[in-house]
């Protein structure tokens, strides 16, 4: 089958439709080698919506294959947008690359349009990148606030995007989900959501070997993102 000639200003029809504008996925190295040798966050990450904003909480542990604790102070939630944050779940390298790519595209959109991208559009972009890119074994949570309200999305490794009032991803999700199912209600304040998120992460660290060593809490409102780390759970309550 013949290939169309490359014409000036014409987009390459063979290009990956899910690629970011600023780079090609072909230029990015996927995590290689034995999966057990890849640094993974293990992880329990939680996102909760309230009328006042979004609360995200994560533990701090990274491990090698879930058997050796390689780092005890990993920040697993990063700001990627003026009023949105994303968690790191899965391989550390893949998650960090994913965050850098998504943040760059969000910044480019804001520069060109003069306004931030909507959170639903940001979630769609994140799903497209997860589906089309070399980001190895990631399953992050995106939480943000825009004119339509507070939003929490889970992004699966195949690019699936699901919005909910609250969600959990990572190796400790079964334990943390139980705490949220028992305590969550629609009228949570931001302070109550913070307390619940921290308690759910703590519950997961009691049983999940991939989670532990403290907690990061991010509060997301229309005014911005605030991220604070605590070496012990008592300090976060």
Curated annotation (Swiss-Prot):
Name of one Pfam family that matches: Proteasome
Domain of life of the native organism: Archaea
Cellular compartments annotated: Cytoplasm
One GO MF term: threonine-type endopeptidase activity
Record has Protease as a keyword: yes
GO biological process, one term: proteasomal protein catabolic process
Major subcellular site: cytoplasm
Purpose of the protein: Component of the proteasome core, a large protease complex with broad specificity involved in protein degradation.
Assigned keywords, A-Z: Autocatalytic cleavage, Cytoplasm, Hydrolase, Protease, Proteasome, Threonine protease, Zymogen
InterPro entries from the UniProt entry: Ntn_hydrolases_N (IPR029055), Pept_T1A_Psome_bsu_arc (IPR019983), Pept_T1A_subB (IPR000243), Proteasome_sua/b (IPR001353), Proteasome_suB-type (IPR023333)
Annotated propeptide span(s): 1-42
The EC number(s) this enzyme carries: 3.4.25.1
Stated name of the protein: Proteasome subunit beta
GO cellular component terms attached to this protein's record: cytoplasm; proteasome core complex, beta-subunit complex
Assigned protein family: Belongs to the peptidase T1B family.
Phylogenetic classification of the source organism: Archaea, Methanobacteriati, Methanobacteriota, Stenosarchaea group, Halobacteria
Keyword Cytoplasm: yes
Catalytic-site annotation from UniProt: 43
Residue ranges, annotated region (Disordered): 1-27
Swiss-Prot/TrEMBL catalytic activity: Cleavage of peptide bonds with very broad specificity
């Amino acid at each position: 089958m013949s290939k169309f000639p490359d014409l000036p200003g014409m987009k390459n029809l063979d290009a990956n439709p899910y690629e970011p504008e600023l780079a090609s996925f072909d230029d990015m190295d996927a995590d290689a080698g034995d999966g057990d040798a890849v640094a993974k966050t293990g992880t329990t990450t939680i996102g909760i919506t309230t009328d006042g904003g979004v609360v995200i909480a994560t533990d701090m542990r990274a491990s090698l294959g879930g058997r050796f604790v390689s780092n005890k102070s990993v920040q697993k939630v990063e700001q990627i947008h003026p009023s949105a944050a994303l968690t790191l779940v899965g391989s550390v390298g893949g998650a960090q690359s994913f965050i850098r790519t998504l943040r760059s595209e969000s910044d480019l959109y804001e520069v060109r349009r003069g306004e931030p991208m909507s959170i639903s559009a940001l979630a769609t972009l994140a799903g497209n990148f997860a589906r089309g890119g070399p980001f190895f074994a990631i399953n992050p949570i995106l939480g943000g606030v825009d004119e339509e309200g507070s939003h929490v999305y889970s992004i699966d490794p195949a690019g699936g995007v699901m919005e909910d009032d609250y969600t959990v991803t990572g190796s400790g999700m079964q334990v943390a989900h139980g705490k949220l199912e028992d305590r969550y209600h629609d009228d949570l304040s931001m302070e109550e959501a913070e307390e619940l998120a921290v308690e759910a992460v703590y519950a997961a660290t009691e049983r999940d070997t991939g989670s532990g060593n403290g907690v990061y809490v991010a509060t997301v409102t229309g005014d911005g993102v605030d991220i604070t780390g605590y070496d012990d759970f008592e300090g976060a309550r």
